[in-house]
């Protein structure tokens, strides 16, 4: 095989309002807006990974094919914070120990507990070990 491999440099999110999403994601991840170039708004780099928001004309209409998993020590507290920043709960799960959330334009991401991830023989992941679940109703 060759002597080099590719590395992830940036995560770019297509959106209608890059200022709005940069504000949401910047507050969520503790990153500042550092640049605006053409249709892009850029957040500060953390751990080598850049994050930008590109303005596009088309609205989001289907489920993401790629999403981020954000690890947190307290799922319910982080859920409340996401909602206060303008995000929302996207789906409920009875098991698995994670929450599917959406940013203000509907881009899905997951909140997962810090720690262990177990994968069964069918490839299904359970976050945080056995017995951890989260409420499935939005009011919990």
Model region roles, listed by residue range:
Residues 17-32, 78-84:
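Amphipathic alpha-helical segments
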Residues 2-13, 42-44, 49-54, 83-140:
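Vicinal oxygen chelate
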Residues 3, 60-62:
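A generic structural micro-feature
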Residues 56-58:
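A charge-rich, low-complexity, intrinsically flexible signal that marks solvent-exposed coils, linkers
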Residues 12-14, 69-73:
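Short hydrophobic/aromatic beta-strand micro-patches
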Residues 29-36, 86-92:
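Short secondary-structure junctions
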Residues 40-41, 69:
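Catalytic beta/alpha-barrel core
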Residues 8, 63-67:
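Eukaryotic phosphotyrosine signaling hubs
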């Amino acid at each position: 095989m060759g002597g080099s491999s590719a590395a992830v440099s940036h995560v770019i999110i297509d959106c209608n309002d890059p200022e709005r999403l940069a504000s949401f994601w910047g507050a969520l991840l503790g990153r500042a807006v550092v640049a605006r170039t053409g249709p892009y708004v850029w957040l500060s780099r953390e751990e080598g990974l850049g994050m930008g928001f590109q303005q596009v004309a088309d609205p989001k209409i289907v489920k993401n094919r790629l999403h981020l998993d954000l690890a947190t020590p307290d799922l319910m507290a982080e859920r409340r914070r996401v909602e206060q920043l303008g995000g929302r709960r996207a789906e409920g799960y009875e098991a698995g120990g994670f929450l599917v959330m959406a940013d203000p334009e509907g881009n899905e991401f997951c909140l997962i507990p810090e720690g262990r991830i177990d994968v069964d023989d069918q490839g299904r992941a359970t976050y945080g070990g056995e017995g951890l679940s989260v409420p499935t109703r939005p009011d919990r």
